[in-house]
Amino acid sequence: MLGDKEMIKRCIMIFPEFNNIEVINNIRKKYDPLANHVRPHITLVFPFQSKIKTDELRKHVENALLKTNPFEITLKNITSARNKFGNYLFLNIVEGMDEIKQIHKNLYTDILDVYKPVWLRGKESYHPHMTVGVVENEKDYEFAIKETEKINEIFTNVVERVSIEIIDNNKDSIIEMEIGLKDNKNY
């Protein structure tokens, strides 16, 4: 494990386990530069670099999740989203949105509050989704939008845990720990 004095880049997310995840994986292989680095996910706490000790972070996440029961999520429809960070393809959450927003809010308190990005500090600024593409070239982006808007698959899962990953220098995701909902069981 990394030393306690080192800066560690982490992210906190949900890794849904859909029966039809191959549909998402195929889209991401085409359009998401991070497809080979991290599994399909919903970000709860965006990447941050800190010296927070593993045990300290575990305790914070366990406390943040204390009153959260496992819950169902449903995702469907891929939409385009342009912002200052790029041209994105988002798989939209249609069920489980309130629970995800509450977890996000609970996590960005205490020791993680200082790592909350400025762009997330406004009212209603967090819109949970699953990124399935980031396309720089405008022509390729327009093609990707047309290709993915035809996809009408529905993705459902019961969220039972939250994952904390370490992002290494190659942008690879290394699961540091997983905390179960309600019972805080460690996976």
What are these regions (language model features)?
Residues 2-187:
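Histidine-dependent nucleotide/RNA phosphoesterase domain, centered on the 2H-phosphoesterase fold
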